[in-house]
Amino acid sequence: MKRTPHLLAIQSHVVFGHAGNSAAVFPMQRVGVNVWPLNTVQFSNHTQYGQWAGEVLAPHRIPELVEGIAAIGELGNCDAVLSGYLGSAAQGRAILSGIERIKAVNPKALYLCDPVMGHPEKGCSVPAEVSDFLLEEAAAVADFMCPNQLELDSFSGRKPQSLFDCLAMARALLARGPKAVLVKHLDYPGKPADGFEMLLVTAEGSWHLRRPLLAFPRQPVGVGDLTSGLFLARVLLGDNLVAAFEFTAAAVHEVLLETQACASYELQLVRAQDRIAHPRVKFEATPISL
């Protein structure tokens, strides 16, 4: 019997709705990965509602929880770590400490860093120290980085003027250490208004993917968290990077179609679960180069 992969997901959690782990855990489980959620934040709901209740996990608790898993002899079964929104650089360093501990018992364990800073339409939402930490420290450790356009702009210190400018910016981030950079949402002058575009960049090549852009009265939150989680899950399940990229784009599109059909602000993960596991649509990633 083939072994089921195990993944430690270190990010925020909301009681109501879907953001952070609340957007990523169930879809990763639905495609066949055992997920260990370590919630860095527990809020009543995501912050785009404008009000919320809850608390943030103190940074020192993260390595404590990792050590607790080690104490029962299970840490070596961790095949990958996913990290998302960081409230501080201290929280980020605590995550890197946990990753170091995991790699000590499983050197093959992968790390995907989702460098959450904000949304292109909503602006940056993290302190400068977090942006600096992600670029100067996390990128050197991560196997995969999954920024959106705002985050890629922040790392690059500029805005792109073309698709090929986006590619150059992603390659500059790749040079900092990751094996692959997945840009979850491209935005550049001249981009077709009816398309949603993504980019995958590795040392071996670069691939561009375009799917239809769906309209919403209010953009659902958690799409980036869903994207990063599914990409890492599919890699753990044996997909090559391009196949994982294509699967992720299709599965996320299926969720958005169901969300749109329900006229919902929150992602309709449960209603779309069968199509997350087996997307009906397919989008082809096409090779591009400078």
From Swiss-Prot:
| Positions of substrate binding | 12, 47-48, 225
Q: Which cofactor(s) are needed, names only?
A: Mg(2+)
Query: Per the record, what are the reactions this protein catalyses?
Result: pyridoxal + ATP = pyridoxal 5'-phosphate + ADP + H(+)
Q: Which residues are ATP-binding?
A: 114, 151, 184, 211-214
Pathway-wise, it operates in: Cofactor metabolism; pyridoxal 5'-phosphate salvage; pyridoxal 5'-phosphate from pyridoxal: step 1/1
Identify the Pfam families for this entry: Phos_pyr_kin
Under Enzyme Commission nomenclature, its number is 2.7.1.35
Q: Which GO terms describe its molecular function?
A: ATP binding; magnesium ion binding; pyridoxal kinase activity
Q: Does the keyword Methyltransferase apply?
A: no
Transmembrane stretches, start-end: none
- Which UniProt keyword terms apply here? ATP-binding, Kinase, Magnesium, Nucleotide-binding, Transferase
Per the record, the GO terms for biological process are: pyridoxal 5'-phosphate salvage
The entry describes its oligomerization and partners as: Homodimer.
| Protein name in the entry | Pyridoxal kinase PdxY
